[in-house]
Amino acid sequence: MSNSTQHWIAQRGTALQGSLTIPGDKSVSHRAVMFAALADGISKIDGFLEGEDTRSTAAIFAQLGVRIETPSASQRIVHGVGVDGLQPPQGPLDCGNAGTGMRLLAGVLAAQRFDSVLVGDASLSKRPMRRVTGPLAQMGARIETESDGTPPLRVHGGQALQGITFASPVASAQVKSAVLLAGLYATGETSVSEPHPTRDYTERMLSAFGVEIAFSPGQARLRGGQRLRATDIAVPADFSSAAFFIVAASIIPGSGVTLRAVGLNPRRTGLLAALRLMGADIVEDNHAEHGGEPVADLRVRYAPLRGAQIPEALVPDMIDEFPALFVAAAAARGDTVVSGAAELRVKESDRLAAMATGLRALGIVVDETPDGATIHGGTLGSGVIESHGDHRIAMAFAIAGQLSTGTVQVNDVANVATSFPGFDSLAQGAGFGLSARP
């Protein structure tokens, strides 16, 4: 079965059991291929996510003159060209659906000697980019967007960048990363502060590639003119992908699964804290470190969940996991309240609206607010769900179908391949009732 099918039929399967290996982390895979391309020397990447988004980023660096070998689906050998070795592309650089790729590349390309154009698919072409182009312009970059601040990004090369002290108005790891990457090329020091701490993948991996960077929660600082040294990276399993199985095992009676070597970046694991507030049974084991990132096995067993007020401080640390959390909330006893999550309205879809509408279609009462929702736990029924081409919405409702009193049809699931190729096959093997329709 392939994620490229048009829709899924999800219905009750069996309790989830066994040990599952989740594909590599998308955020780490993007950065690994990007930083390896900018490094001096040859880097080997193991556990690379073979998804559409990460393939787009790798293909862009190939267009920029970087040789990338693919010994296997989950490996890349990158022949770095150094920070000053990228070559002018012959045409537009297509980021596909990858907001991470586009925003981080904007920081890198802003400092090159050549012009470039970053484009994306229909979904990415609706996403806000001024949050990135604004601070880059403060550094001296020249980047044009559409009149509403959306892609394509037309990057004018040959600009001399200056380091800045930037207080980001949004808690966004992508904005922070774009500014820091431009800062590598800038004169002087570049520092970024955030209203709330965000994921520090960029900081950890730049350090792994030999860059001197000072960082702590909500703060990062580096000086320009540094070079990256090639290194080998082992990409951990993607926490956001694991999240769907964490939630599924928590709400499907009789379940007990182990998820191997999952990345547990402290700015990524808000979902674990939220689920534990709701009574989930999640145990961490075999802690280690892969490529500067903390990892552990997660043992998850079914537990009756109860509604909870989700602390706003957790929101930036679980921004991609809210679709899965909403399904957990629907299955819980009582009400779950989410606030401070307006960022969900400008993801691959308006995730607050999409999840609220979808859960209502299955009989769950949801009170939507501008920055969140109250989900009243109940019984999930049958219905037809529009995923709006959003991979995380699609996977969330595949879980919902496992508790449905009937069947859940999830439309437009092709984009699941952007982050989790093979999700449906892995889910079936674990016990999901899930089938594909053309």
UniProtKB/Swiss-Prot annotation:
The active site is at D320. This is 3-phosphoshikimate 1-carboxyvinyltransferase. Keywords: Amino-acid biosynthesis, Aromatic amino acid biosynthesis, Cytoplasm, Transferase. It comes from the Bacteria. Belongs to the EPSP synthase family. It is found in: Cytoplasm. 3-phosphoshikimate binds at K26, S27, R31, S172, Q174, D320, K347. Pathway: Metabolic intermediate biosynthesis; chorismate biosynthesis; chorismate from D-erythrose 4-phosphate and phosphoenolpyruvate: step 6/7. The keyword Cytoplasm applies. It catalyses: 3-phosphoshikimate + phosphoenolpyruvate = 5-O-(1-carboxyvinyl)-3-phosphoshikimate + phosphate. It holds the Pfam family EPSP_synthase. Phosphoenolpyruvate binds at K26, G99, R127, Q174, R351, R392. InterPro entries: Enolpyruvate_Tfrase_dom, Enolpyruvate_Tfrase_sf, EPSP_synthase, EPSP_synthase_CS, RNA3'P_cycl/enolpyr_Trfase_a/b. PANTHER family: AROM/DEHYDROQUINATE SYNTHASE, PENTAFUNCTIONAL AROM POLYPEPTIDE. The keyword Cytoplasm applies. Its main location: cytoplasm. One of its GO terms (cellular component) is cytoplasm. One of its GO terms (biological process) is aromatic amino acid family biosynthetic process. GO terms for molecular function: 3-phosphoshikimate 1-carboxyvinyltransferase activity. Its EC number is 2.5.1.19. Catalyzes the transfer of the enolpyruvyl moiety of phosphoenolpyruvate (PEP) to the 5-hydroxyl of shikimate-3-phosphate (S3P) to produce enolpyruvyl shikimate-3-phosphate and inorganic phosphate. Monomer.
